[in-house]
Regions:
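Nucleotide-activated sugar donor-binding and catalytic core shared by glycosyltransferases
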Residues: 1-215
């Protein structure tokens, strides 16, 4: 990861809190947030300080996701409203920013990539190379028709986990949240996979450079 990107990610993590476990769910679609929130509720029993960051795929859905989270009773915030350290009472942050997702992945402990968790017409997954390139373990669903080769390579490399339903998602999240060394091993496997298959420096720069001028 370029030094400048690493610095941005470190600053984001400091604002979230270095001590809280953080899961970033990126490129989510309608229906997936419900699944994620249900899984999150179950995880709070074992990880009461867990922070879930949800980055909807489409900006026009930011407001509806904020309302969905509020209806379910979670303490939430919008990333665009954050100034300085995040209130420790916030359980879920909505990443209502553009171009920032790779840095959010880099600041996370675990990444969940949307567009794959439930069947969605016309959608067959999203780019799992983003979290892999920054050394973060990735979880994705079975609906990866548009990224079959990449997902197969990632699974073979031990760079992530594929889940079939909410129960499976909870199991894999618990496994990773409970095991920091495992997160390191899986994240490093993803970084090496990107390096071996596409060239880490070029890929990481292509993924992240556009956001360096975007908060």
């Amino acid at each position: 990861m370029p030094a400048s990107v690493n610095e941005v990610a470190q600053a984001v993590r400091r604002d979230w809190s270095p001590n809280r476990p953080v899961v970033v769910a990126g490129s989510t679609h309608e229906g997936e947030e419900n699944l994620l929130l249900s899984a999150f509720q179950s995880l709070l029993n074992d990880f009461p300080d867990l922070l879930l960051v949800i980055a909807p795929r489409h900006p026009e859905r930011f407001e509806s996701v904020v309302k969905l989270v509020a209806r379910q009773g979670f303490k939430a915030s919008r990333r665009t409203m954050q100034s300085g350290a995040l209130d420790p009472d916030v359980q879920i942050q909505i990443a209502d920013t553009m171009g920032e997702l790779p840095v959010l992945y880099a600041a996370a402990d675990i990444a969940v990539v949307g567009g794959s968790l439930i069947p969605i017409r016309g959608i067959g997954g999203h780019n799992i190379l983003e979290p892999c390139a920054v050394g973060v373990p990735v979880i994705f669903g079975r609906n990866m028709a548009n990224f079959l080769e990449i997902s197969d390579i990632a699974l073979s490399a031990g760079a992530g986990f594929q889940v079939g339903d909410k129960a499976d998602l909870i199991v894999q999240l618990k496994r990773l949240l409970n095991d920091a060394p495992l997160r390191g091993v899986v994240g490093e496997a993803g970084r090496k996979m990107v390096e071996q298959n596409t060239g880490a420096t070029q890929t990481t720069c292509e993924l992240i450079l556009p956001l360096l001028t975007v908060r």
